[in-house]
Amino acid sequence: MSKVEAAVAWARRGYRVFPCHADEPGREGNARRAKKPMWEGWTEWASSDEATIRSWWGSQEFNIGVLTTDLVVVDIDMKHDRDGMASWFALYGGFDTLTVRSPSGGLHLYYTGANVALNQGTLGAGLDIRSHHGYVLAVSVR
């Protein structure tokens, strides 16, 4: 599935998306750059309109940012000696929501509801929250 089709699939599920820089393996600073939105103001410009999304992506393979305003996304990391999965299961015991593998190999748990403050690690080792005025990188969905 192309990135534009994946972005449209997220929009059809009701999520607002926007393009982030594409991966360019071998380019200095790629890991940081590929997670950045293509432009400032992405919180206002994010859209679920298919025509808008198609015009943004065209034939480009931009990464897909999903706006997390009106969502709470738990980011479970499994790298750099952080076992977010163990932390999550110790706290909550399982998954009860849309769960997708993140681009880095962890998991994103999508919850609708009130916005919460962004944080890193306060829920437990390897657990981060993305919410109001935040975003996560998405993967292809069907």
What would you call each of these model-derived segments?
Residues 1-142:
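Conserved phosphate/metal-binding and DNA-contacting active-site motifs used
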